[in-house]
UniProtKB/Swiss-Prot annotation:
Assembly information from the UniProt record: Homotetramer.
Pathway membership: Phosphorus metabolism; phosphonate biosynthesis
Binding positions for Mg(2+) per the UniProt entry: 58
EC number(s) given by UniProt: 5.4.2.9
Cysteines paired by S-S bonds: none
Effect the entry attributes to changing residue 122 to A/D: Strongly reduces enzyme activity
Catalytic activity: phosphoenolpyruvate + H(+) = 3-phosphonopyruvate
Protein name: Phosphoenolpyruvate phosphomutase
Keyword Magnesium tagged: yes
Annotated catalytic residues: 58 (nucleophile)
Impact noted for substituting residue 114 to A: Strongly reduces enzyme activity
Length: 295
């Protein structure tokens, strides 16, 4: 009899795998299911994407309880682990450790916390201040999260924003080492350069002290094999499903508005039957046959 591997264990194994692993952004239950069907072994619960699909800015305008509600639907809709983009932890150590417990309750496999101040500013904003948290305070926040988890395989990823904030390699390395020593299961090293030079410098200096996660949204032209050669553990494709859906909705809506007709869009969009399939409507039909009276 085979034993199903817990989602938390799956994520931990991915972070510590010798192979380069990939996880894909999702922002609701439907997109989570699509990501799984595509073959991805894990899901990134993007803060930007979850905020955007709620119609608010990526500045903690959506409360942590609203985000967790979305993540519950995503977890229910998929069998692969979800790593939540948990921003700064929605406050101090106490908010962050409470978040961890609530994520565990909902079957989320891990949380990624960034070392900036609450409320956060999206890392890809140009010309916006990116104040960093005190190193010791953030390291203790990581420790509080690790101490509060009940599942030993629940993963805490510490996201270092030193390069984003304009600091150099020494600061990035100092922060990464502090967070690793505090118990972080992996370090996410972020950069918004159009080339991977920040990541290259960090990986060389880091010297395989622990798993490293990257988000190549800005340096997307870099061949994936280069990340393998550097020793990166995991790549996050961070917001592309949300961006693709916005493009599709804009085009479809404009076409219908201009044409006052559905003729030119019907063959470009999925059928209602496909939506039913993604919702696993067949399971409900079978359940109705089994549990509803026949007359």
């Amino acid at each position: 009899m085979s034993t199903k591997v817990k989602k938390t264990t799956q994520l931990k194994q991915m972070l510590n795998s010798k192979d380069l692993e990939f996880i894909m952004e999702a922002h609701n239950g439907l997109s989570a299911r699509i990501v799984q069907e595509a073959g991805f072994k894990g899901i990134w619960g993007s803060g930007l994407s979850v905020s955007a699909q709620l119609g608010v800015r990526d500045s903690n305008e959506a409360s942590w309880t609203q985000v967790v509600e979305v993540l519950e639907f995503m977890s229910d809709a998929s069998d692969v682990p979800i790593l939540l983009d948990a921003d700064t932890g929605y406050g101090n150590f106490n908010n962050a450790r409470r978040l961890v417990r609530k994520l565990e309750d909902r079957g989320v496999a891990g949380a990624c916390l960034e070392d900036k101040l609450f409320p956060k500013t999206n890392s890809l904003h140009d010309g916006r201040a990116q104040p960093l948290a005190d190193i010791e305070e953030f390291a203790l926040k990581i420790k509080a999260c690790k101490d509060s988890q009940t599942d030993p395989d629940f993963c805490i990823v510490a996201r270092v924003e030193a390069f984003i904030a304009g600091w150099g390699l020494d600061e990035a390395l100092k922060r990464a080492e502090a967070y690793r020593n505090a118990g972080a299961d992996a370090i996410l090293m972020h950069s918004k350069k159009a080339d991977p030079s920040d990541i290259e410098a960090f990986m060389k200096a880091w010297n395989n002290q622990g798993p490293v996660v990257i988000v190549p949204t800005k340096y997307y032209k870099t061949p994936t094999d280069h990340f393998r050669d550097m020793g990166v553990s995991m790549v996050i494709w961070a917001n592309h499903n949300l961006r693709a859906s916005v493009s599709a909705i804009q085009q479809t809506t404009k076409q219908i508005y201009d044409d006052q007709s559905l003729v030119n869009v019907e063959d470009k969009i999925v059928s209602v039957k496909e939506i039913f399939r993604l919702q696993r409507d067949d399971e409900l039909v079978q359940a109705e046959d089994k549990y509803l009276p026949k007359n």
